UniProtKB/Swiss-Prot annotation:
GO biological process: protein folding; protein-containing complex assembly; urea metabolic process
Keyword field contains Chaperone: yes
Name of this chain's protein: Urease accessory protein UreE
Protein's UniProt keywords contain Zinc: no
Residue runs in coiled coils: none
The protein's role, per its UniProt record: Involved in urease metallocenter assembly. Binds nickel. Probably functions as a nickel donor during metallocenter assembly.
GO molecular function: nickel cation binding; unfolded protein binding
Key words of the record: Chaperone, Cytoplasm, Nickel, Nickel insertion
InterPro entries membership: UreE (IPR012406), UreE_C_dom (IPR007864), UreE_N (IPR004029), UreE_N_sf (IPR036118)
Gene: ureE
C-alpha cells in the first residue's frame, strides 16, 4: 500500500514507480483511496484543496516512491463551432452554469449531460460523444502549482 503525501516538482531524470490514472473528478480529491488496475491500493493524503493535473508527480510518505498522475480516459462531450465567436459564446454559457470545461482554441470539452448537449446543439455547435482524457480548467481561484 502506498500513501501519497506530497506534490513534488516534475523532474524528467527521476524514476517513476507507478502511473496512477485518475478521472477529472478523481484528480480533485485530496484524500481518497484508489485501487490501480493491477489491484495495488493507493491512498491520497494531500493538503486539503490540492487539485491534481495530468503529469503531476507525487511522493509517498517514505520518500521512496514517485508516482505520476495521468488523466484517465472517460466519457466526454466535445463541442466544435463554425466560428471562434460561437465557441466563446458557448464557453460563456457553460461558465454561467459552473460546469467544468476543457477550453482550447478549437473545441470545448465537458462531462456528458443531455441538457447541456441540447443547449449547445441549439446554439449551432457540433457535439461528439467520446472517451478521452478530460482536463477541465481549474478556475480563477484554483490551486497554483509550483511548475
Amino acid at each position: 500500500m502506498l500513501t501519497l503525501t506530497q506534490l513534488v516538482t516534475p523532474n524528467p531524470d527521476v524514476a517513476i514507480t507507478l502511473t496512477l490514472f485518475l478521472t477529472a473528478e478523481e484528480r480533485c480529491r485530496s484524500r481518497h483511496r484508489f485501487e490501480t488496475e493491477d489491484g495495488q491500493v493507493v491512498f491520497l493524503r494531500l493538503p486539503r484543496g490540492t487539485l491534481l493535473q495530468d503529469g503531476d508527480i507525487l511522493q509517498d510518505e517514505t520518500n521512496g516512491n514517485l508516482i505520476r498522475i495521468a488523466a484517465k480516459p472517460e466519457p466526454v462531450l466535445t463541442a466544435v463551432a463554425q466560428t471562434q465567436l460561437l465557441l466563446m459564446r458557448a464557453a460563456y454559457h457553460l461558465g454561467n452554469r459552473h460546469v467544468p470545461v476543457e477550453i482550447t482554441p478549437t473545441y470545448l470539452r465537458l462531462s456528458p449531460d443531455t441538457v447541456l448537449r441540447t443547449m449547445l446543439e441549439h446554439m449551432g455547435l457540433e457535439i461528439t460523444a467520446e472517451i478521452l482524457p478530460f482536463q477541465p480548467e481549474l478556475g480563477a481561484y484554483g490551486h497554483h502549482h509550483p511548475h
